[in-house]
Structures are given as structure tokens and as C-alpha cells.
């Protein structure tokens, strides 16, 4: 049997505090460390905010969240 390695899956979603709902989660990349995953989640969050734009964010009170989920790989 192969050795099991822990990796981290970056999962992001866009939510609206105005409407109280979120779009479906989007799985992104796999990372070897928590640091790499959380850093990329922050970078992706800022990029998503820039893409959506100030007007869209303000109108719908949008915010972007992310989490790093631990996964076992072989």
C-alpha cells in the first residue's frame, strides 16, 4: 500500500449578505501545505473582488469566502 499524504483543497464561494445566500462552492487547486492553500485563497479572494467590481459588490453586498479542506491522497 502507498503512503497517505495530506493535501489541502481550496474551496471558494461568493455570498450575499443582502439576500442571505451563497452561490455553489467552487473547488480550486490542491496544495501541499496549509500555508500555500490559505495564501492562494487570499489572492483568489482579492482577484474575485476585482472581477466583480465595486458596484456589484456594493449593490448586492457580496463577499467572498474560502476554506482549505484537508484531504488524504495516496
Residues covered by each model-derived region:
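A short, exposed loop/beta-hairpin motif centered on an aromatic-Gly-Thr core
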Residues: 22-36
Amino acid at each position: 500500500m502507498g503512503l497517505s499524504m495530506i493535501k489541502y483543497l481550496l474551496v471558494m464561494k461568493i455570498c450575499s449578505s443582502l439576500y442571505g445566500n451563497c452561490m455553489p462552492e467552487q473547488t480550486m487547486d490542491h496544495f501541499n501545505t496549509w500555508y500555500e492553500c490559505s495564501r492562494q485563497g487570499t489572492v483568489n479572494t482579492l482577484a474575485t473582488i476585482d472581477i466583480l467590481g465595486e458596484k456589484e459588490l456594493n449593490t448586492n453586498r457580496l463577499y467572498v469566502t474560502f476554506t482549505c479542506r484537508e484531504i488524504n491522497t495516496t
